[in-house]
Swiss-Prot record:
Residues the record lists as binding substrate: K74, N119, A120, M121, G122, F123, N181, N186, N246, T247
Listed SUPFAM superfamilies: FMN-linked oxidoreductases (SSF51395)
Native species: Sulfurovum sp. (strain NBC37-1)
Gene (name only): pyrD
Protein name: Dihydroorotate dehydrogenase (quinone)
GO biological process: 'de novo' pyrimidine nucleobase biosynthetic process; 'de novo' UMP biosynthetic process
Length: 354
């Protein structure tokens, strides 16, 4: 049993505005490694691994298939605390070449009735220099890390490749994979880069600079046909995988939405799944697929896995359910695999298409 109730913690944090609550949670996560006995104790409460759900990707062992989605740890400050929350891997960022404050506040909102989050953060982060400092502190920390990269707001679309080039050079020897983020709705013009020519150019550039696996993260707000075409272009150009999806700007999903920013959480679940399913049918077996967007249970994670996901990511639903959710997903996946007669998760990946 967990040694504390997340419901109690949530009640306290939800007394603050969302961004302040995030800052307070971050202070706790940064402090946790300073008390190894407590870190070890919490890790034992929440971290689940089993040969059935352990996998190898990019030359690294992923002890379980549930990772933290990008956006929570924008500056790489909480990496060593992530196993304590139950995650098998983490994705830090989005990081930009130069520090930037992001969009004006308020820019983060809880949609309580919908168990969702709406954010218009705008890649607020301390820049690549600060993140490199954090990564250089890790030394012998053996844990899969993805680095999510994006362009600065002040960088024009015409010069966007220059920002990504700078970031590829900076992180070519760090982490286990790099994610190209051109799908956030909160940087003006960024989603316009989701076109065939830019995809070809950026992956060609990546291959010249780094041997790191480079993945593409896509938005949910496109037709299935366009998404499949974009992903095929990326894979043909050298993408090591696809992450689907980012937040949605479909404000028709709820009457509680603001008219700006991206929506994540429960409202995104079905939209994200349907797009991922279309991509999975086309690309399963051709590249690594990671599904993210409103995953709030083992059953939902399993649905994504059967549609082709080798890994899944969680962020917004962590805020509503706490780290017990990650434990429940991993334990639930083991039960679901056994129920269907599988001996390893790899047998279930893409089961809908076998």
């Amino acid at each position: 049993m967990p040694f504390f109730s997340y419901d109690t913690v949530k009640k306290i944090l939800f007394n603050f505005d969302p961004e302040t609550a995030h800052t307070l949670a971050g202070i706790g996560l940064r402090a946790l490694p300073c008390c190894p006995p407590l870190l070890h104790f919490i890790t034992k409460q929440y971290f689940v691994t089993d040969p059935m759900i352990e996998q190898e990707f990019f030359g690294r062992t992923f002890k379980n298939p549930v990772g933290l989605g990008a956006g929570f740890d924008k500056n790489g400050q909480y990496i060593t605390s992530m196993p304590a929350l139950g995650f098998g891997f983490t994705e830090i960022g989005t990081v930009t070449p130069k520090p930037q404050p992001g969009n004006p506040k308020p820019r983060l909102f809880r949609l309580l009735e919908d168990r969702s989050i709406q954010n218009a953060m705008g890649f607020n982060n301390r820049g690549m220099g600060y993140m490199l400092e954090q990564l250089n502190k890790l030394y012998f920390f053996d844990y899969p890390i993805g680095i999510n990269i994006g362009k600065n707001k002040v960088t024009s679309e015409e010069k966007a490749l220059e920002d990504y080039e700078t970031l590829f050079h900076a992180f070519k020897d760090y982490g286990d994979y790099i994610v190209i983020n051109i799908s956030s709705p909160n940087t003006p013009g960024l989603r316009d880069l989701q076109n065939e020519q830019f995809i070809k150019d950026i992956f060609a550039m990546a291959k010249r600079i780094t041997e790191q696996p480079v993945l593409l993260k896509i938005a949910p707000d496109m037709t299935h046909e366009d998404a499949i075409a974009l992903c095929n272009t990326a894979v043909d150009a050298g993408a090591a995988g696809i992450i689907a999806t980012n937040t949605t700007i479909d404000y028709s999903l709820t009457p509680h939405a603001k008219d700006f920013g991206g929506i994540s959480g429960a409202l995104l679940t079905e939209k994200s799944y349907q797009l991922f399913k279309a991509i999975g049918k086309e690309l399963y077996g051709k590249t690594l697929l990671i599904s993210v967007g409103g995953i709030d249970s083992a059953e939902e994670a399993y649905r994504r896995i059967k549609a082709g996901a080798s890994l899944v990511q969680v962020y917004s639903m962590l805020i509503y359910k706490g780290p017990a959710l990650i434990r429940e997903i991993n334990e639930g996946l083991i039960k679901l695999l056994k129920k269907d007669g599988y001996t390893h998760i790899s047998e279930a990946i893409g089961a809908d298409w076998k």
